[in-house]
Amino acid sequence: MLDEVVTDIVARTPVSGGTVDILMYHSIANAPGPTSIAPRQFEAQMSALASSGITLLRMDDVPGHLATGHGRAVAITFDDGFRDFADVAWPVLRSLNLPAMVYLPTDCIDGAENWKGAHRPPRPLMSWEEVRRLASEGVDFGNHTAAHSDLSLLNINQVAEETERACLRMQAEIGFRPVHFAPPYGRSSCDARKVIARHHKTSVGTELATARASSDPHNLPRIEMFYFNNMRHWHAHLDGRGANYLRLRRVIRHVRESFL
């Protein structure tokens, strides 16, 4: 009898906190590969999002929404700081009043991608002058390490050096230390996340899922927007009917990775 009462109470107790779809983009360009989204496609995705009525958050507000918020929210993130963010993505976002976080590999700013797995030909990144202008216009910037390093291959001292060097460069260039982080390739270890947590409020990975109150704030899942090039799937997701599609994409990704 007692077990039945406890079960009933648990079933009727509301789950605290809201949910956040943290969208993941890289480059907005007419180029092949999963890290590029065509400009017209990006504009369609953002227009649909802006019309959806879903709450839009800055990354600063994500932890609070997950802990005590209500309902669905979305945060928009970009990895790597490609120049097309300034030229293509930001004008669209600004026109729709949508906030964005851009994670910068600080050694690569003013240059082009030069890391393992980089696109060929290499895509240019923004300049520090562009970063400063965008920061003044309301774009948020986070830490993507100094050299776009795979943290899973580094020891703890190297992780600390990579993250701190990026923090110091951003402090020097744009006047503040970043408090949000994204490990390159989405890879980090438990020990690396402990180092990251010392100076960053959040860290995002590449697990394909919606962030919830139970999510690790230093390994938050994201929604890879390459999977929503088909606007039918994107509209269904925004309408709250996308769980099965997201689940299918996770299974396909897991199967593909198991053969690598």
Model-inferred region functions:
Residues 14-17, 50-51, 91-98, 124-143, ...:
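Acidic (Asp/Glu)-rich catalytic clusters
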Residues 5-11, 86-88, 116-136:
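Alpha-helical scaffolding within the catalytic cores
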Residues 28-31, 108, 147-150:
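A short, flexible beta-alpha/helix-coil linker loop
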Residues 77-78, 142:
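Generic enzyme active-site microenvironment
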Residues 1-77, 83-86, 153-260:
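C-terminal active-site subregion of NodB/CE4 polysaccharide deacetylases
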Residues 111-122, 148-156:
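Surface-exposed cleft-lining segments at the edges of enzyme active sites
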Residues 23-27, 140-148:
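Histidine-centered catalytic micro-motifs
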Residues 97-118:
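A short, conserved beta-to-alpha structural element at the edge of catalytic cores
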